[in-house]
């Protein structure tokens, strides 16, 4: 049997992993500017953590969950999204306690799992960056969080980003709109896709989210949820729009956007960018003021977003963005003969301990092959170390581009490599 990775997964090899690490580090730096701290939750949760929060009727729960019973007959699921596990952790660890500074700002970076048809930018194991902010109902929280995502895209150089905005209002507003949508869609039930016929009975707002052609046609003239917002919901949404304008963040109102998860209320948003003529969502989120209470905590407002790392990296590549990834090596040691083997290890280790990147030959190859490796590694400096150099206690180091060279003692190399490097590279 030929052993291969499971369908819908990927191996991220070192060349690509460097891009991942760069994007993750920019995200971490950005979030820390906004006073967010990292949280790490388990990759698997009790099934109810996801099903009850995300929604029993959502596609995630009905079609896409990786769930199983463990040896203790506990119903377990691999996490399909990040918000529910973070809310569970927030409640379980009593981060709502008065001594904890509010709002509580958390971010996560990690794997999520959904059993769906693998396609471009969509895998069964995928990686998500997400943020959650607990404890502030202030519309400024909505705008700050949206602005943070916008700031991240600016730092990464992503172009043509458009903010799509909508409000789902309060539970009362949503209930009134739900009925209006049922009244509108019921006469055209037979024209809907099979999935949306089911959604019409279980959660009619999800019909607006459908990607099926017949469903898109059916909802073209559907009533707008913004016409059903109560006074408080309307005031919240107006404040969000005003603050976005104050920060010069352009937006478009998208009344058919409802988000695929059941826990959202008030502000919801997506950032969309154009890639090769197609619109792609790169980030989505919104407000969820009832979720903490649903998990047994006190009623606590929340706001957050998630973005897929695979999709973000695909957009970076398609938009031709070059990430400033350091690929050069400081020095390569070409090693000739068994008598130089031990000293080469001593020297390369001493150089690394001074904060430099260094590599040496371990395979006993001819000098030409070793120099070729130095070029492949983009080594700035190259040193040839043979038995005669070991006996003399010194060797020649060359600038691999200019060919300028200098003879240095091993003692200098092991204690003051910075000066040697500066001398040859300046």
Curated annotation (Swiss-Prot):
Pfam families: HGTP_anticodon, tRNA-synt_His. PROSITE patterns: AA_TRNA_LIGASE_II. SUPFAM superfamilies: Class II aaRS ABD-related (SSF52954), Class II aaRS and biotin synthetases (SSF55681). The keyword Transmembrane helix does not apply. It catalyses: tRNA(His) + L-histidine + ATP = L-histidyl-tRNA(His) + AMP + diphosphate + H(+). Its EC number is 6.1.1.21. GO terms for molecular function: ATP binding; catalytic activity, acting on a protein; histidine-tRNA ligase activity; transferase activity. One of its GO terms (cellular component) is cytoplasm. Keywords: Aminoacyl-tRNA synthetase, ATP-binding, Cytoplasm, Ligase, Nucleotide-binding, Protein biosynthesis. GO terms for biological process: histidyl-tRNA aminoacylation. It is found in: Cytoplasm. Gene3D superfamilies: Anticodon-binding domain, Bira Bifunctional Protein, Domain 2. It comes from the Bacteria. PANTHER family: HISTIDINE--TRNA LIGASE, MITOCHONDRIAL-RELATED, HISTIDYL-TRNA SYNTHETASE. Belongs to the class-II aminoacyl-tRNA synthetase family. Homodimer. This is Histidine--tRNA ligase. It comes from Streptococcus pyogenes serotype M1.
